[in-house]
Amino acid sequence: MRVAGAAKLVVAVAVFLLTFYVISQVFEIKMDASLGNLFARSALDSAIRSTKPPRYKCGISKACPEKHFAFKMASGAANVVGPKICLEDNVLMSGVKNNVGRGINIALVNGKTGEVIDTKFFDMWGGDVAPFIEFLKTIQDGTVVLMATYDDGATKLTDEARRLIAELGSTSITSLGFRDNWVFCGGKGIKTKSPFEQHIKNNKETNKYEGWPEVVEMEGCIPQKQD
């Protein structure tokens, strides 16, 4: 009887040890698999983050070099959506800021520091061009000037107003017409014509909207004024 009891005990212990071994092996395999999945997910997340394109100031397509201001701007869309002007990741004018209006929208920026000097809009359909002309005459040398049309920016423009804008570096201002879309970035005291200007004519054959051309957009890097 004692021999039989001892044999049963040995068998029971052996079964227990075998069961424990099997369970431990299964657990170890699952643990290895879980850790493997965890590391795989971490590597995948890291790869996704590393391949995500970087975001540059104002959402422009590439970073600006040192001593340059990043800017992006868009004209208005028909008479529904106002223009938008962004400089150095700071939205200067937009419909959301509620500081845009029909006509020519203009932002003045210190060409050395990038600080905003003023933002205004002038109604060139139902307004008076005289205040706009006086405003243009007050712009100081070294000032960066950004302009964008909304609805109609040309009807009330006079030759004098166009000349003052041309002196800021604009080429297209002489041909800006009724309901054309136009964006421009120039400066007071500029010695050459500005490379930053886009102009789309109002043409019923090509207009995107009924009575208005498509929105015109522009981005770039403005050289910082040096002493």
UniProtKB/Swiss-Prot annotation:
Compartment(s): Secreted; Cytoplasmic vesicle
Induction annotation: By TGF-beta in epithelial cells.
GO CC terms in record: cytoplasmic vesicle; extracellular region; Golgi apparatus
Superkingdom in the source lineage: Eukaryota
UniProt tissue specificity: Ubiquitously expressed, with highest levels in the retina. Up-regulated in mammary epithelial cells and hepatocytes undergoing epithelial to mesenchymal transition (at protein level).
Gene Ontology MF term list: carbohydrate binding; cytokine activity
Transmembrane stretches, start-end: none
S-S bonds: 58-86, 64-221
InterPro entries: FAM3, ILEI/PANDER_dom, ILEI_FAM3C
Residues covered by the GG-type lectin domain: 67-225
Protein family: Belongs to the FAM3 family.
Function: May be involved in retinal laminar formation. Promotes epithelial to mesenchymal transition.
Name of this chain's protein: Protein FAM3C
Species for this entry: Mus musculus (Mouse)
Lineage, uppermost ranks: Eukaryota, Metazoa, Chordata, Craniata, Vertebrata
Originating gene: Fam3c
